[in-house]
Amino acid sequence: MSVKIGRNDPCWCGSGRKYKACHEAFDEKIARYASQGHIVPQRNIIKNAEQIAGIKESCKINIAVLDYIEKNIHEGMNTAEIDKIVYDMTTSMGGIPAPLNYEGYPFSVCTSVNDQVCHGFPSKDVILKAGDIINVDCSTILNGYFSDASRMFTIGEVSPEAERIVRVTKECVELGLKAAKPWGHLGDIAYAINSHAQENGYSVVEEIGGHGIGLEFHEEPFVSYVTPKGSEMVLVPGMMFTIEPMINEGSPDFFVDEDNDWTIYTMDDGCLLYTSPSPRDLS
C-alpha cells in the first residue's frame, strides 16, 4: 500500500518537485486503471530521470562490448575467448559484468550456440564453426545501475533455415518494441511477438521471458510473450524492461542441462534468442 502524500510534499519519485506538480495526475490515472481491474506497476519499478540516465550510461558499456564482439567474432574462435573479451572490456570501462557470480553463475557472459536456448556456458571446448548461430547475452553494472542485452550472430555461411529464423526473430523483437507504448499492456507486446512467430511456423518459449531492469539485474515485471493483447501489467512512463523472446523452430519445450543446472536446450533441433540492443525505456 502506497503512503498518502500531501499535494505540497516532495514527490515520491525523488525528483525534489512538489507532488502536485510531478506525479499526482500520474497516480490518479494509475488508480483509475486499477479500479477497472487492470494490473498496475508498483512505484518501486518506476524509474526517475536520474535513474534512467544512470541506466543509459550502463547501456553504453553493454552496447560497446556487443559492438566489439560483432566486429571480431569469427569461425575458429572458442566461446571462452568471448567471455574474456566481455570481462576485459567491461571492467576497463569501469563496469562490472552482471552475470559473474550472480546466483553462482561462473562467467561474465552467456554464449548460447545452436540448440541452446539461453544461459550457455562459455568454454574453450566450444569452437565456433561455419553454419553456427550464437547468442551472446551481455549484462553490465555501472555505478549500481544494470543493463542487459544480447545479439544473435551467424558464423560463416549458414543454412537458409538458420537465416530465416534469425530474420523472423529479429522481426518479432521489432514488432514487440513497436507495441510497447505508454498506457498499453505487456500483453500487447506478447501478442505482437507470438502472432508473428506463429504466422511464420515458429513457437515461442513460454516459461522464460523478459524482465524489469535497472536497479537490480532482474526486477518485476515478468515479460511473457504468449499472453493475450490487452492483458498483463499496464505500461507506464518510467518502466524499463527487456524484450528478449526465445523463438523455436520446433516445439516451445526445453530442458535444463543437468551438469551445470543453468544452460537451457530446446527439446528438438533449432532455437534462437534475440533481444533489443538496450532495455526498453517507457519514459
Which residue stretches match the model-derived regions?
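Single conserved hydrophobic/aromatic residue that forms the stacking wall/gate
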Residues: 274, 278-283
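A conserved acidic, glycine/proline-rich C-terminal tail/linker
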Residues: 248-271
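Acidic/negatively charged segments and metal-coordination signatures
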Residues: 1-45
